[in-house]
Amino acid sequence: MSKNNYINEDTYQTLQEVSIETQSDYEKAREPLWKQNTNEFEKYQIFVGTPVHSDESIHYTQALIEFQKECFQKKLKVSFHLIKSSLVTQGRNLCVAGFLESKATHLLFIDSDIYFQGKSIFTMLKANKDIISVPYPLKTLMWDKAFKKMQEGKIKSPDDIRRSLHTYPMKVPDANNIKLNKGVMEVTDSPTGCMLIKREVIEKMIEKYPDKQIVQKTVINGQYVNKPNMWNFFDTLHDPKEKTYNGEDFAFCKLWRDLGGKCHAYITDAIVHVGEHQYQGKFYDELISSK
């Protein structure tokens, strides 16, 4: 049989582009999801936390739907927690509070403007790191950087141009000595938009940073309520000595490193940071450049 779409009659799942060569392949494609694959991830439970200012992108929603299907297939328990907050710092702390009220083994931050691959999360789980993230490009295009590489003769294809336009919000212990193990490397700071955190990390921070507890009523999804398990682990950080300002993601990594912990990044899977791009131009330039 050739490649086609088949409907799994038990789960109403569309199996797209499944390569069917033999009768056994056909039966496997029809097999209900709960009978497929392995129990490798059964011991884990993921709490997906998303702080939202107003809405989320369709790309984020598509990624979550696909991830939920993959978790179901791998028998991995997953729950989703979207919290509305005008402050991303407060939103992340509220996600932590919700995570602590759950029985999940891992907190997975996925921001509402991120499109990720489920396989990246499963790889990070298997890496077994305390804090591990998938770094994503900033919402800016580095044209000067790309032009410099072009002058140096390092641009050989359109893909080279695309890759040269990006910069990533991440710091490493030693830029001259980067060690990569199965796509995983140690970092000092990385973004929180796609970050997996072990429960033990939060529990140790509660023990070591008791002064960061928050006890006050908070507006949650329009309701003014008491929220237990609130801790200020995500907050901006100003360094008066270095005269630098860091976001809540780098500040969180520093809290963990100050306790002797390490942070890591998984860098070999593609990820999308969804943002607006303004396509500015005038047709006159097209006429001039074509001469």
Predicted feature locations:
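Active-site nucleotide-sugar/metal-binding loop of Leloir-type enzymes
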Residues: N93-H106
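N-proximal low-complexity "stem/linker" segments adjacent to membrane-targeting elements
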Residues: S2-S85, Q90
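C-terminal catalytic/acceptor-binding lobe
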Residues: S2-P32, T38-K43, E207-K291
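Active-site acidic short loop of glycosyltransferases
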Residues: K43, S102-T105, K129
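Conserved catalytic core of nucleotide-sugar-dependent glycosyltransferases
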Residues: V96, Q117-D235
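Residue-level detector of anion-binding/catalytic polar loops
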Residues: K77, D130, K262
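Residue-level recognition of beta-strand->loop/alpha-helix junctions
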Residues: L82-K84, P135, I267
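Short beta-strand-to-loop acidic/aromatic patch adjacent to the donor-nucleotide binding site
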Residues: A104-Y115
